[in-house]
Structure formats: structure tokens, C-alpha cells
């Protein structure tokens, strides 16, 4: 097991900035906006040959009701599971009542606490730290997370007290497994579904659209298979995205789609299938990611409403015939147990190796069942196929005049290969390449005999044309 370092403090003291500095990433969303981080974000910090798991938490102590109370509980959970706590305070704002309350709570936690005075850029470190001696936590480390000043000395002190990590406890890419991104509109139940799959209140859930603002990666294991769930912020229509923070959240959601191997698109059955749901599905299809459709809040619908939702699915998601549908209730757990089975199947299909002889046999069978159409009086010829990539599977077909293949025939080939190789759950991309003409770049040089013959043909053609004119 790796040691765990929790970053705690009031909102907007620089915890996410320090998290990004320690992990060498930009995983935590950072903006000059208090309360931006709401869920626990995990990363790996490496220092002088050692490593540890670092946890970014939401702000503590500002409000204990609603979302603020949920954030406080998430921070407490991080403290309870930590081997060391870095308590960040704002050197420019000075010590506050909120800092004193958090310090009192940390003293009761029975865990090593390191007080870090952040935002000391342009300030005398000794003067900035002096204001916080009254918190009763020693020693005081003055740092500037944005520039990295003092962070190395802070890590020296923290790692000196941490238990040694096992050599192979953390891979070079951090927690592994199948990366699964949860996407959808705000308040459709993504975080509730994540907590249901994990079996714990891992991310903040509240009956308010936009509770999740950052993309939170949560590694876990089920039946020997490792996964990384990525809970994302809800994406609204562009016209409704006003705040800068929300715009950054949308970007992080789109990045999560690119990072994922499988995407779960969560929709709200009570609100029906909307254009925005179809728009998000289009993003997944464009990225080429495997997809599982989750229709949440299914338990609250009567039979007529369920029939309407199924009709809307067929209408708006007609282009997602390859994706499996699951009708679930994340709140009560009905239907959730089969989701990971679909995730594994989609992931396996997206990364399947397709042997070239089998692809060519399938191509010949497809041609025998349905020949390509004529183009300008000539038959389009498809000669051979091979695999060109994974996630999504790419099948490259070589032939003549392939650039004139109709879109309908491309869909036929896509569906044929999907049925033949069981590529359900993932899009399949067909790339057509025209066979090279070995004489394409060579000048057309005639022999002497060919030139004389060409001149005779031209001469006779002119004579025939003159005779026709005289007859008129």
C-alpha cells in the first residue's frame, strides 16, 4: 500500500494548485472561485525516489449545510484515511476563525499535520508565517504553490514521517484498470451511480444541478477486474453555459471522454431523451469511444412513460445501434449490477485484435452477399482488408475507386464486420484506400512507331471530317 497525503483547508486557499504542482498534472480544476473542488481527487506525488497518493479535497469550514456540508464530510473522509495531512492556509488573508476550527479538528484526528502557509509570493516568509503560530501546529512551512517555492522543503518534511511505500504499489501511469467516463446532462444522477457502483459515498451528491464541477477519477476493483471511474460535470447546451468555471468543466468532461476506454452516457428517464443527450452521444462517437447507454430514474415511470422513452431512444439514438441499453435506478440499485459486464464487453470489443486472413474472408463474404454498386459504369473493386488500429477498431480496405463508395454501403460493411467479429459496444471505422497505380507519376512517352500510328489516325480522322462537311 502507498502512503496517503490529504490536502485540506478553507475554500480557495490553493489546494488544487498545490495538488497539480505535486502530481505534475492539471487534473484538478483551478480558478479564482471559492468552492470549486467538491469531491476527492487522487493523484501520485513522487519525491526523492519515493511516492505517495495525494488527495485534493473540497473546502472545509465555510458552510455546514447543503453542498458545503457534503464537501466537509468528503474532507473528513480523506483525513480519516490519510497517513499525513497538509493543512493549507492563505498567507495573504491571514488567520481566520475557519482556520482555527479546522486546526482544532485536525488536532483531534491523531494524524501528523503539516501547516503550509500558501500565497506568500512577494511576502516575507517569516512575517507571513508568524500570523499562524497561534493555531498550535508546528513547524510552519511558507510556500507559493503557483511557483513551487518552498514545496520541496514541505515534501522533505512530509516524506520523512511517511511509512515506506511498496516498490510496485503504484505503476508509472497511476491507478490502472479500464477507464470509464460518466457523462451526461446536469443532475441526471452520474455521481449517485458512481457511489452505487463503488458501494460508498465517494463523491458529493446533492439535489442541485451542477454539484460536480471537476472530473474525478476513482480507481476500484470488482471481481478481480480493475476500473477507474471518471465522474464528470454535467454538460448543458452551449447557450446556457455562462460561467467561466462551467466552461472549464465542459472542457474537462470532453477531455475525460478522450481519456476513457468506455463511456457511460447517463440520461434522465423522467425528463426523456433530449437533443443534448444526442449531442453528447455525438461527441463520444466522434472520439471513437466504446459506449454504454444508461437510462436512469427508470423506477419512477409508469408503463406509458416507459414506452415513450423507448420510442425516443429509437428515434434520437438511431445512430447508436451498437451500444447496449440499461434501464436502472442509481438511487435504489435496480439494474446497476449488469453495467460493468457491458463495460467489460465493450472494452474487449474496442481492443480486439482482428487477424488479416479472417478479415479478408469476411470481406469476400460481404462482397458475395452484396456487391458494391457501379460508379460511372464501372464496378468498384474491394481487394483486401487489414486492421488499422484499436479503440475504436479500424478496418482498412484497399481497392479501386473506393473513394466513390456510397455511405450506405460503408454502413453495410461496418455492420457486417460488427456481426462477424462481435464488435458490439464500440464504433467500427472503415477506411478505404485506393490501390497505387505504378505508372501514375511516370510521363507517358510514346515510341517512334506509336507516334507514327497516332499521326496516321489523326490524319484519317481529319479526312473523314472534311468528307462529312462536303456532303452537307
From Swiss-Prot:
Q: Which InterPro entries match?
A: G_ENGA, GTP-bd, GTPase_Der, KH_dom-like, KH_dom-like_a/b, P-loop_NTPase, Small_GTP-bd
Start and end residues of each KH-like domain: 352-436
Per its record, what are the GO molecular function terms? GTP binding; ribosome binding
Q: Where does GTP 1 bind?
A: 9-16, 56-60, 118-121
- What ranges does the record list as Basic residues composition bias? 450-472
Superkingdom of this entry's organism? Bacteria
- Annotated stretches, region: Disordered: 434-472
* Residue stretches making up the EngA-type G domain: 3-166, 178-351
Q: Which CDD domains match?
A: EngA1, EngA2
Alphabetized, the UniProt keywords read: GTP-binding, Nucleotide-binding, Repeat, Ribosome biogenesis
Q: Which residues bind GTP 2?
A: 184-191, 231-235, 296-299
Q: Which GO terms describe its biological process?
A: ribosome biogenesis
- One short Pfam name that applies is KH_dom-like
PANTHER family for this protein: GTPASE DER
**Family per similarity comment:** Belongs to the TRAFAC class TrmE-Era-EngA-EngB-Septin-like GTPase superfamily. EngA (Der) GTPase family.
Could you describe the subunit structure of this protein?
A: Associates with the 50S ribosomal subunit.
Q: What does this protein do?
A: GTPase that plays an essential role in the late steps of ribosome biogenesis.
Record protein name field: GTPase Der
Q: From which organism does this entry originate? A: Halorhodospira halophila (strain DSM 244 / SL1) (Ectothiorhodospira halophila (strain DSM 244 / SL1))
